[in-house]
Amino acid sequence: MGRSPSSDETGLKKGPWLPEEDDKLINYIHKHGHSSWSALPKLAGLNRCGKSCRLRWTNYLRPDIKRGKFSAEEEETILNLHAVLGNKWSMIASHLPGRTDNEIKNFWNTHLKKKLIQMGFDPMTHQPRTDDIFSSLSQLMSLSNLRGLVDLQQQFPMEDQALLNLQTEMAKLQLFQYLLQPSPAPMSINNINPNILNLLIKENSVTSNIDLGFLSSHLQDFNNNNLPSLKTLDDNHFSQNTSPIWLHEPPSLNQTMLPTHDPCAQSVDGFGSNQASSSHDQEVAVTDSVDWPDHHLFDDSMFPDISYQS
């Protein structure tokens, strides 16, 4: 809240000074000086307050006022004094002959303050701004990461990456072709590229569904020239039957085509025995004509509790 005007200041003129008012003030000060600014307006014949006369003389009318652009030496002096004194413009102006405090303040706000900010300094402390340092640091880190990605892309182009993926998939197919298709001619495991197995193990996406024991047993069959047929692999592996009798002694055609005998099909009370007698005789005939490997069958781990009965 501003100071209320006194009775002596009531009706005084305010606003811009006229040239006639400037001449009266200059002539009076040249003749009498400015010992008392409160009594000067009445003595000089001015309808102004003492403060207005003082500011007009100090900032505009005194003969030693230096006009024009600030020099480089004056700018350096203002910066050094502001770092020590702060915004004490009157004390700064006392070290610059011919410059007023108001002129120095305006020059600071319009030029020097903006210049310090652009240079990365705090205009109040004259120290480097930490926020600019952190912002520039994040930009430098982003540029560094981008440079690393560019270098990596130059070392491994996209075409080479696509070619490597294609070679991996073809290696998988080649290995399955060796495992699943029958081979009448002798084949050595040395003919298989070892990179195929390495690529398949690294991928994990396909090898996770393959039994490693099953894979190793069939790789040994390559050297023994005992490669099983595709149907044998389907019947044994995908049905989870890995009995040694089926791996070392492939079944004959008669054994694979042999119909199974379901005990549940027999009648409990003898009902329907005549109707099933003809089909039963045929099954007995087929069974008698087939040489079953009983000594191997009951030795298998699938029949631990069944004893052979003649």
From Swiss-Prot:
GO molecular function, one term: DNA-binding transcription factor activity
Keywords on record: DNA-binding, Nucleus, Repeat, Transcription, Transcription regulation
InterPro entries per the UniProt record, alphabetical: Homeodomain-like_sf (IPR009057), Myb_dom (IPR017930), Myb_TF_plants (IPR015495), SANT/Myb (IPR001005)
Gene3D superfamilies for this protein: Homeodomain-like
Domain HTH myb-type, first and last residues per copy: 9-61, 62-116
Main location, first listed in the record: nucleus
Tissue specificity field: Highly expressed in roots and at lower levels in leaves, stems and flowers.
Its biological purpose: Probable transcription factor.
Subunit record text: Interacts with FBX5.
Official protein name in the record: Transcription factor MYB53
Organism of derivation: Arabidopsis thaliana
Organism lineage: Eukaryota, Viridiplantae, Streptophyta, Embryophyta, Tracheophyta
